[in-house]
Design a protein with these regions (language model features):
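Intrinsic-disorder/low-complexity, polar/charged segments enriched in Ser/Thr/Lys/Arg/Asp/Glu/Gln
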Residues: 12-18, 90-92, 108-110, 122-126
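Hydrophobic/aromatic beta-strand elements that line small-molecule binding cavities or substrate pockets
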Residues: 71-84, 109-117
Length: 171
């Protein structure tokens, strides 16, 4: 069981997504180890400005209506390990985020971002997280109808923005 799973023990819905960066593992790892928060902020703000919208960390369009919120991300731990018998290296960042303003209106996310080489020139970003919907029982009902899809789309966009930023920044 991973650290997030051990911490939350399935206390919320799960989200998993991945993307890749066409740069060697060591360069991607070093960029995220050096200052992951700046990478996350730069990636999401750059994506928001490209879309000519208000800069926000998480954003998703639902039926043509944009939902955006700034988030406060904290990196709880960074660890390096070997994935398999072939000594494939991996780095895991334990993340937590919540809305920067009015956090009770948005889910709390606890996640792992694992980084490992796919090839000598490509690196995988693998996100696995659990989130707690707001509003208790009512929030769980809303989550079952539409909330989980909103959370999935926003996390997918976040990882896509981070991967896109790293592709350009490391070029």
């Amino acid at each position: 069981m991973n650290l997030v799973g051990a911490t939350l023990m399935s206390k919320g819905p799960e989200i998993r997504c991945y993307d890749y960066v066409n740069h060697p593992y060591e360069r991607v790892r070093d960029a995220l180890r050096q200052d992951a928060l700046t990478v996350f902020q730069s990636a999401t703000k750059a994506a928001a400005s490209r879309a000519q919208s208000i800069a926000a960390e998480l954003h998703v369009d639902i039926g043509g209506v944009g939902v955006k919120t700034d988030i406060r991300i904290s990196v709880k731990n960074v660890e390096e390990k070997v994935l398999d018998a072939m000594s494939t290296p991996a780095t895991r960042l334990l993340l937590e985020w919540e809305a920067a303003t009015k956090p009770r209106l948005f889910p709390l996310m606890k996640a792992e971002l694992s980084i490992y080489p796919l090839t000598a020139t490509e690196t995988q970003l693998d996100f696995w997280g659990l989130y707690e919907p707001p509003f208790g029982a009512m929030g769980k009902a809303i989550n079952a109808i539409v909330g989980h899809r909103i959370a999935e789309v926003s996390v997918h966009r976040f990882i896509s923005d981070v991967a896109g930023y790293l592709r350009q920044a490391l070029a």
